[in-house]
């Protein structure tokens, strides 16, 4: 795939390096949160993408960074869920946002996933006890197959 390295670096920085650094720097705070609320634990919600689960032409770099986010959260669970810290990646298909404007000639906005649906999923995960770990949620549009 033809992809300028400058754009590659920016995509990697925004979609993976920055979230990795935030997570890494947050671990001490999350551990304190577990001490204060052992039953609720501490939770991390990461926004991934369906492109990190299923490949799509033209989205190689974007999809790779989102797949890295999925792996990061699953590794967080392997390392910290026994200590009460867990993470969930939400990997939606096309959501009706400015980022999906480029698809609206093929996918009408009124068929896309609503932002509110993603917010509600995150809120639901946050209400779970520390004993429940949901590594990833893959969300697709109604009437669309997986990967759409």
Name each model feature, range by range.
Residues 54-60:
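Active-site loop immediately N-terminal to the catalytic Tyr-X3-Lys motif
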Residues 49:
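Residue(s) in the substrate-gating loop at a strand-loop-helix junction
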Residues 25-40:
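A short helix-coil junction within the Rossmann-fold of NAD(P)-dependent oxidoreductases
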Residues 54, 75-85:
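Active-site-adjacent segment of SDR/Rossmann-fold oxidoreductases
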Residues 82, 89-90, 97, 105-148:
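C-terminal helical subdomain
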């Amino acid at each position: 795939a033809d992809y300028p390295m400058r754009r590659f670096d920016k995509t990697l920085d925004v979609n993976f390096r920055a979230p990795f650094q935030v997570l890494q720097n947050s671990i001490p705070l999350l551990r304190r949160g577990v001490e204060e609320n052992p039953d609720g634990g501490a939770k991390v919600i990461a926004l991934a993408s369906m492109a990190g689960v299923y490949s799509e032409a033209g989205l190689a770099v974007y999809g790779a960074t989102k797949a890295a986010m999925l792996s990061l959260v699953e590794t967080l669970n392997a390392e910290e869920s026994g200590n009460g810290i867990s993470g969930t990646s939400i990997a939606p298909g096309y959501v009706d946002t400015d980022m999906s404007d480029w698809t609206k000639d093929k996918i009408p906005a009124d068929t896309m996933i609503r932002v509110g649906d993603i917010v509600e999923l995150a809120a639901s995960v946050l209400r779970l006890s520390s004993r429940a770990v949901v590594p990833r949620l893959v969300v697709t549009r109604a009437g669309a197959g997986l990967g759409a």
